[in-house]
Amino acid sequence: MCGIAGFVNLNSEPPQEQILRNMLIPMICRGPDGEGVRISGPAALGHRRLAVIDLLSGAQPMCNEDGSVWITFNGEIFNYRELRTRLLRKGHRFRTESDTEVLVHLYEEYGTEMFAHLSGFYAFAIYNVSSGKLLLARDCAGVKPLFYFQTPEVFAFASTIPALRRHPAFPHELNRQALWDFLSLQYIPQGTAYRKVRRLEPGSFLELNLNGSSAAVRRFWKPETLHENKLQISYRDACAELEKRVRQAVAERLIADVPLGVFLSGGVDSAIVAGLAAEMTDSPLHCYSIAFREKTYDERESAAENAAWARQFARHGLIHRIQEVDPCDISILEKRIAEYGQPFADASLIPTSQLCAFARSEVTVALGGDGADEMFRGYERYMAMRYLEKSDFLPAALRKILTGTICSLLPDHGGERGSLARARRFFRGIGASGAERYLGIVSHTGESLKRRFCGSGFEGMRPTLEQFDTEEHPFGKAGDVPLFDLRTYLPCDILAKADTASMSASLELRSPFLDRRVMEFALSLPENFKEQNGHRKRILTDTFARYLPPGLARRRKRGFGVPLADWFRGEWKNLLLERLPQGEGEKSGMFSKTGIEQLIAEHQAGCDRSYALFSALVLEMFLDSIKP
């Protein structure tokens, strides 16, 4: 994995190499093994390299034989050897053994039809000198990020927003609607923190015609088509096919010319990956886990149980290491927010960053279990949405009365977290529908609470739910929720966190469950194969039961939680008082000093406001990081 950046001047000015090199500076941690730049006519392509495959000859930007096609590429193509063989038969000539060069020739052969042939994760830019076109592309799941902006004079792109900010034409105006949405969800679900900066969506490509300066974005992967056309297959045959695909995905992700390991939690997904990887590796498998001092959040015992169970499949042994989270190091959070270039308040970014740094001392590549919950209906909200949908036969007026009556019986003094808070969010869903129902379940900070501590800078903001239920992407039924998460939560939260944390440590993170063949098969399965009678991830746990310790499959899922409430009453108490009431958020009008102080006081008095406070703190850190 690497960092890419570049720009195309749309006027007659030749590109300045120093601008490109400046854009690469914030991405040194993404690619510590080398830097490359290429100026070709109006186009400037740059690259920071983390060497994983073909260590000696894979430097970028890279071109074809005659220099008419250039690429800068971030990611891994796992079937590149197969593609290389096929392209050789068609007359293509290669100078390296790298997957990057395969992409160049695949583009020559198939143009924008090339994506159907790829197995892997990627974000890349290809400049075609002959046609005067620039192509940007991002993988189906959105594992690798890619941002861009366009003005009348320039089109620029990069793996990170801080890299884009180094371009003199960067449009700095903030997207306040995106920041408003962030305060509810803890991530930005659509767009970016900047009004004129775009994020290339997963499974999409952008083609810019330099002759006409027109850019068009198209989707090459449409998961809703698979979701709507379910396979006619027996459960037994589906289990066999799933095992074959996941095994292949794990085997491909074990290919590397550097040391690799596995991230192991106390859950099902990573236990499956660890068991399969242990079975396939030719050396001792290194597994890494995170632990907390706070027992409620600590998974070290269940992670150790998973490691012990996986050890029986290891042909060459298994080494398990555990890292305990240090809550005192707030600098980790500030660094990650600055590197990401946007506010991001999924608190598990902190332990994930510490885990990546811990693992990087021994390995360069790590496998994880991201994506299984979205593919196989692992989240509680999927069941909650199904149960709530059963109330839709009642008249809307009656449902609203029921909601009000039930919620009035549930005390509200406990704050945003805990079982009572979850119950309130669930029962409010009886009186709602579609996106409003979904957001009521997943939003940690509701509209009314936000308005209590936000200032005039957020006046006129639309409710977050209006951003979701659109004509292009209607929300639909409860069965569509995983598709919705594929567009928003997975790429914008889970994978953004994984990319930011791993790249900060120069570590490549791979997830077999995000293999395109696994995803497409999972999406096309009947829903009762994935969830039945409260058994979530049914087909996954049944298929790989031998790799799971007894009882794990039915154990209640524990999210990757962080003890924020305790930290805000302990190690981070003074941090809130020092940073929030008179910080950049208050100066910009985004926060109300009185509202913030009241929020802090409520939390210290026992009403859990940790989600709202953490989102506010992160937004403050972001605003502080972009001060002139």
What do these predicted ranges mean?
Residues G46-L56, F124, C140, A256, ...:
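Short Ser/Thr-interspersed hydrophobic loop/turn segments at strand-loop and sheet-helix junctions
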Residues F7-R21, R89, E109, V129-F155, ...:
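ATP-dependent adenylate-handling active sites, centered on carboxylate activation for C-N bond formation
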